[in-house]
Amino acid sequence: MKKSLSILSILLGISASAQVNVAATAGTATATYTTVKGAFDAINAGTHQGVINITITANTNETATAALNRSTGNSSFTSVSLKPAAGVTATITNATTAGPVFRILGSNVTIDGSNNGTDSRNLSIVNGFATGSVVVTMGSSDAANPLSNVTLKNTTIINGVKTAGSGIIVSNTAGAQSAGYFNNIRLENNSIQRSYQGIYMIATSLVGNGAGSVITKNDISASGENSNRLMGIYLGGTDGVTVSANKIGNFDTANNESKRGIWLAVNTMNSTVSDNIIDNIGVNNLAGGSATGIQIFTNAGAGNVPSANKILRNKITNLFSSGLNSSVTGISLGGSTVGTVISQNTINNLLNTKGGSSTGLGAEGITLNTGTASNTLVSNNFISKVSSFGASFSGSTGGILINAGSGYKVYNNSVYLTETQNDGTSKGLPIALSITSVTATAAIDLRNNIFVTNLADSSVPAYATSIYFSTLFANTDPKVIFSNFDNNIFYSSSNLAILSVTTTPTVLTNITELQTTYGSNANSLRALPKFVSDTNLHITETSESLEIDNKGVALTEVPTDIDGTTRNETTPDIGADEFTVATMAVNDGANRSKIQVYPNPVNDVLTVSSDKKVSNISVYNVGGQLISEVNHSNVINLTKLSSGVYFVKTVVEGKVEMTKVIKK
């Protein structure tokens, strides 16, 4: 019996000692350890050198932070890699001491959680400590020796609590949320759970600091007990970081705080934030709280270099708040930020339900609130289903809200608002484009946009656009704030536009009044585009869209649309979608069905003959402009039309046919 127990003890000892295997090309070639800390300590002491590979064969319980120091002094390595053995799924846990599980201070390090060379996540790194925990930190406090070429990928990172701390911090040697020095850091395909902040990257503001770093394909959207709480990804002071294809959302909703999917903070520059999905972020706390998909508040970068951040092709959906003094914003641009591009983003389902007052609280798809000469381009964005109780012109429901500043180019955006909040006491004020407190001459260049507010609730006032000046700027002429203002489509189920500088605003009901009051817009239209749906703002490529086809002006800054489709070089479409109306529906007389249009050519009255009831006849010129229409009649008088070619659209029991007609 004693012999059996002795053998068992030996076997268990061998198993325990084989949890972490180390192989090196210099120094001690191979060794085994019970913890990653043991392996890192040996590397720091110079026991293993050269190219070092660490293989995890079973779970480990770390008793303190596993810190890998810089290769200097006794430590001498070319590179270090850590990964689970083939076929092994393992967990590395530290539940006994404060501090991170891993602290990476040495360059040329790769932690890959896949056990088969793919994107599978087979390694979990867990901090089970109860207070203020962090899972992985990395960085340098030495400007002459920045941390570089570190990759952390294919892992599951679980923090001990979500009341404080982060899943991953990239900063300085101490691993605190203080600025450090680093470049070429890659954080890829990690699942980050139960954190206060998912990824926190902060650099000392210096040209090139952070360059080449990539945060991509991470999942920060766990729900339930393992949900994250405050913020998905934070960048501060970095230069040249890419944040792409991350999934962020499902945050804890209980606390009164400002939640953000992605935050570009002070001195962040030359970043590209693209193709991220931000979904289901909000606050259910009556005391307050706000939700923002992407916030850019960077000011100028190092050496006053323009921040030049790009926000591209992100999908931001289902943001909400129900609290006092709360706000909901898809993309928020503020500070003295310069050179930002916000393009090809899709923003929908933003909801602020705090009501019960005369003004309510707002929600906006995109908010622009920078300083002067911001050189900001906002183009090719879809914004829809934004709703709130905001009822003042400075705090309404806005598709795009330009709140202050200048240097804005707002081109080819599509905004479609269809909902508002109305509890019988408070009502929202939906405005597709809202301009407030902008007074600088030629501050805004506004062309090729679609601004539509189309509500089913007729008791709620709604506007396609508004301009608001506080009493301090009551004498400002709205015409002076635009450098260009034309080739836009406006539509509202209530009034088209409003100018508010006093307690009695000026309501504008048609394009002529808008042209007179706002200025320009000679080529703008009042029309209701036929979108695919309330949240899919692609234009239906049918004859119903002829009226708005090819009505834009060519702009060099917008060569493609929201999908990357090349735009017409001379007469592009208005809005974010470049579309082509199908021409095969045109009936030139050779392929007539049971619908007959005659006489053709016509002098005066045109008749539509059909065995079904005709619900609509519309006449368009060759440019697609609606000239005349009648409903529930099979004749239309064309006497006053000039001679030429026209297209007649007939609608019979929902079926549409286009016929080319010659007017004598």
Which residues does each PLM region occupy?
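Bacterial Sec-dependent N-terminal signal peptides
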Residues: 1-21, 583-586, 600, 654, ...
